[in-house]
């Protein structure tokens, strides 16, 4: 038997003298506090005495993570559920950025760039540039907000002085550019800017104020076309990514384009930077927290990843895939089923036209929250507590793509606000407050929208001025208006002759002229003759107007789709309402439906253009026919014989 040390012998004797502890099911708060204190003071002794967890530790509940001052941080973020204002471009808006010098810059698909100045409440227009002859591929603003650049498929880069809103340089690149980014920091001798070639992995570094000759070329850093280039101004490092999922760290001219020395890793195997390649995805958006320590990305697999910049280790992953939203809708309904289906169709179209690459992510000024657009609206995520704390624009009929966040006070005052001024009851000083604003671009719209802390005054009124018409109508719109002044093409009543009886309707040509014109011209031309009611849902509606009878066909009298015409006095507030069927916003063709119950959830989604005045019993009989439960198509065809327009 081995000899025992003195301390082992004393401990063994103590164990023998200790009485057997009674079983405890619960501990009082005082006992719990004392036990925790004793366990902390005598860690070494406890480790020798016990094998496994202490009884007190086993009863400790895991505390929920809380972000201190979260309410204060949220007070400085937009909170309105609906957008306050929207402004126009001539074409679909694709990009938006916000500068530290209180400017908002928007770019549209036709190569135009607009400068807007943030004021105390809202924004004001500053200047309009025809920047490129073709499509704008990417825009970027410098870290201090002094310089802005854009690249387009006209093989050119335009450089602007933001504060003086003037174009100061133009570079002829000689290749089709893909991405661009200012990679200099305040104090650097050269205002360097990076641009990538769209079809290869090459990165060219230029002097933004210089000539067309590149200062440096990265030709082996990436082997696939680049998807993002972003500067971390705190650590003076650049992060770039390509379509193969590879992510690289590098520096600009002051550090001779080498690997940054201030990061805490040397080999990628020590990081999670291969995560995208493992998932066969790539980043479509990259941004950094204000302190430079966090990096947020959105991937082509629709996952949001939050990582530590210095170590490259993953912190959080948020799944925003379509399958996740479908499961969420099934578990707990987020939207009405029809609206959810419409938004899912928009998401699939996003993927079809590769517009997912335009969705971006931004940090707030604290670095505790990220904001990005989803099919439910703009999500505000607390990355510390792993919770979605707010959704902006859930009620709106827009799919948010790019967004820019402004926080702070736009109007600069001559004197700084002192403690005495803050404590005073001066009403003028009390009016000086922050106006946090999210400026976002939607999918396939020529407007950009602003979410603030203020809800719009009246969204249902036709005279609501939250949508500002700051652009002149196009030539096509003028011609369409001129043609409408010719022979009368519309009427205020029609009779739909069906195989089950006649339906008399009243139309609204004043409130929705284009929709009524489309219906009347189609009816006069015999377009609807022989069309079946291809979709009938008992207790909801009957739908027709598709020449194919599948629900996928039909077009307008202009040979395509036309825009919605919502009016405050025309609602789905009663049965026997005529309304246009669509596949999303501004996709009206020839299909229409007649409701058999009030359907208020369809307001501002489908254009109401008529009411049934006689023949309600015919509509009811049609809605009660037997249908295929899977397709809602009647077993025996009910068809339109013809439509008489009075």
Curated annotation (Swiss-Prot):
Inhibited by cyclosporin A (CsA). It is found in: Nucleus. Residues 490-645 form the PPIase cyclophilin-type domain. It comes from the Eukaryota. GO terms for biological process: mRNA processing; RNA splicing. Coiled coil: none annotated. It catalyses: [protein]-peptidylproline (omega=180) = [protein]-peptidylproline (omega=0). The modification N-acetylalanine is found at residue 2. Residues 1-30, 455-490 are annotated as: Disordered. InterPro entries: Cyclophilin-like_dom_sf, Cyclophilin-type_PPIase_dom, Cyclophilin_A-like, WD40/YVTN_repeat-like_dom_sf, WD40_repeat_dom_sf, WD40_rpt. One of its GO terms (molecular function) is peptidyl-prolyl cis-trans isomerase activity. WD repeats lie at residues 88-126, 131-170, 221-260, 278-319. Pfam families: Pro_isomerase, WD40. Residues 17-30, 455-478 have a biased composition (Basic and acidic residues). Its EC number is 5.2.1.8. One of its GO terms (cellular component) is spliceosomal complex. Keywords: Acetylation, Isomerase, mRNA processing, mRNA splicing, Nucleus, Repeat, Rotamase, Spliceosome, WD repeat. Belongs to the cyclophilin-type PPIase family. PPIL1 subfamily. Identified in the spliceosome C complex. PPIase that catalyzes the cis-trans isomerization of proline imidic peptide bonds in oligopeptides and may therefore assist protein folding. May be involved in pre-mRNA splicing. This is Peptidylprolyl isomerase domain and WD repeat-containing protein 1. The gene is PPWD1.
